[in-house]
């Protein structure tokens, strides 16, 4: 089967999910979505995208928001189905574990929902409290047994056990307004970015004991572990990327982005390059060896989450 490398992304203010040819920037498809979709996750076969219907413009806007996860067929470029999250609303953080289970985080109700067979059942099989207030993002161990939730109003990160509700959430501090988070590849370390304190905190992924910090630029919103074993912070306020040694927490490099950086994605077959969504409605490509950043292609309004996939030719 012939495939083309494709960047798929949410266009938050365009209320859509689109795919772009990675080399030409040509739009391959656009799927209309309800107002203000935000985060998404890709299934194990890398053929379905699950998009959370947040339903309000930003975390600072009032409203109940949406109560669904929309499945998008990435090969056909069309809607595939809907997972019903009601009565839980403002679906933001989205994750998928190694077994294909979908995890959806309700920011309004501070609940983590689990869809154990999303292709067969469109309602949650499990729901567990996040242990925080205004729970915004989450990251997941590969087996789905541990979830880490950052909450904007309780200013906490919590360790949640989605498949054992008898275990209460374990909370820790990681600075005010923690948001971006990621696990080390061996899942022993958790990294959390504080938007208000401009800092990364490293925590033991089992105990949440702090083991190091690093200062970032203004307003770090996302963290990524790169193929070259660097921790990358996206600084929304500073309009920059900063690179850190994840073991020593030493800063290694800075890349100014011009526009505000929103999301980063690595190429599965080309570990030397990453693609960066920017708030000027564009995607840039970053050479991870030279740290040169250049324009790649224009997008719809406010690109958000981003992934690089080999999708079948139409």
Predicted feature locations:
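Predominantly soluble domains enriched in secretory-pathway, periplasmic, or organellar proteins
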Residues: 1-314
């Amino acid at each position: 089967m012939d495939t083309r490398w494709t960047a798929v992304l949410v266009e938050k203010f365009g209320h859509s999910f689109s795919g772009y040819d990675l080399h030409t920037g040509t739009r391959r498809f656009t799927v209309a979505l309800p107002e203000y979709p935000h985060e998404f996750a890709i299934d194990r076969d890398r053929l379905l995208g699950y998009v959370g219907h947040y339903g309000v413009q930003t975390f600072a806007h009032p409203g109940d928001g949406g109560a669904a996860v929309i499945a998008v067929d990435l090969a056909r470029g069309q809607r595939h189905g809907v997972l019903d999250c009601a009565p839980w609303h403002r679906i933001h953080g989205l994750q998928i574990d190694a077994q294909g289970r979908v995890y959806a985080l309700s920011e309004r109700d501070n609940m983590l929902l689990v869809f154990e067979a999303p292709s067969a059942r469109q309602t949650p099989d499990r729901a567990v409290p996040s242990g925080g207030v205004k729970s915004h993002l989450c990251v997941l161990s590969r087996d789905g047994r541990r979830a880490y939730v950052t909450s904007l109003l309780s200013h906490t990160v919590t360790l949640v056990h989605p498949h054992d509700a008898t275990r209460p959430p374990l909370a820790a501090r990681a600075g005010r307004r923690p948001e971006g988070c990621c696990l080390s590849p061996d899942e022993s370390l958790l990294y959390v970015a504080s938007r208000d304190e401009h800092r990364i905190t490293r925590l033991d992924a089992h105990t949440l004991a702090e083991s190091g910090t690093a200062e970032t630029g203004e307003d770090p919103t996302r963290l990524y572990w790169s193929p070259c074993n660097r921790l990358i912070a996206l600084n929304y306020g500073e309009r920059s990327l900063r690179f850190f040694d994840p073991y020593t927490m030493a800063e290694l490099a800075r890349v100014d982005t011009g526009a505000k950086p929103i999301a980063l994605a690595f190429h599965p077959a080309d570990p030397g390059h990453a693609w960066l969504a920017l708030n000027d409605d564009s995607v840039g490509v970053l050479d991870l060896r030279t740290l040169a950043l250049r324009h790649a292609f224009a997008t719809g309004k406010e690109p958000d989450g981003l992934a690089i996939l080999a999708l079948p030719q139409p």
